[in-house]
Amino acid sequence: DPADRRWRHAFINSTHCGPRYTLTRRLPYDRPQTSMAAFAMCPACRREYADPADRRFHAQPNACPACGPRLALRDAAGRPLAVADPIAETLARLQRGEIVAVKGLGGYHLACDATNAAAVARLRSRKNREEKPFAVMFANAASVAPYAEVNAAARALLEARERPVVLLPKRAGCDAALAGIAPGLAELGAMLPCTPIQFLLFHEAAGRPAGTD
C-alpha cells in the first residue's frame, strides 16, 4: 500500500515476524539489550508498541522509515556509495552482472543474476566452488514453474514460513536458461524470499506494484 507509512520499509517487522536472536546482545530480550537500542521509537511507533491490541505490541525491533535503521550500499572495500535508492541500485548492479552481498537475517547471501552465465561463473571462481550447486531464489512459486516441476507438496514447502531450499526436478531447458547453477544434476534447488530486503529486490524488478499485483 503506497499510502502506508511503512511502504517499502526494508526493516518492517511485528511480533509475528522479523529478527530476534540475531539482534540480541544479551538477555533479557528487551530493546536496550539489542542492536535496536540506538534507534529511539518515534511517537507513532511508540503508540503501536504500547497498544495491547496492536500486532506490534512489545515488538522490540519496532521501527519505521522515520525512526529506524537505513539501508546503505557499500563497495567491496566497505566504502558507502552515494546512491538515491540502495534497492534500485542493487537491482541495477545485479542486472549488469555484478555480485552483491545481500544482508539476510543473520548473515549475507552472495547474489548474482542466475540467468547470467558469466556472473554465475565469476561467483563460482570467487567462492572456489567449481561444481557444488547453487540455490536459486525466485519471486514466487509460479515463477519457479518454467524451470522446475512444482506440485502441490513442493509449493507448500516453498511457501512455508521456514522458507527452505526445495529440490525440484528440472524441466527441459532449465540448464540452458540457468547455465552453471546445478551442472550435471537432475534437480534444482529453489527458494522464495523471506526478508524485507529480498522481497524489495523482487518488488523493484516487478516495477513496484501496489496491493496484491
Which positions does each model-derived feature cover?
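Active-site-adjacent structural elements in enzyme catalytic cores
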Residues: 1-213
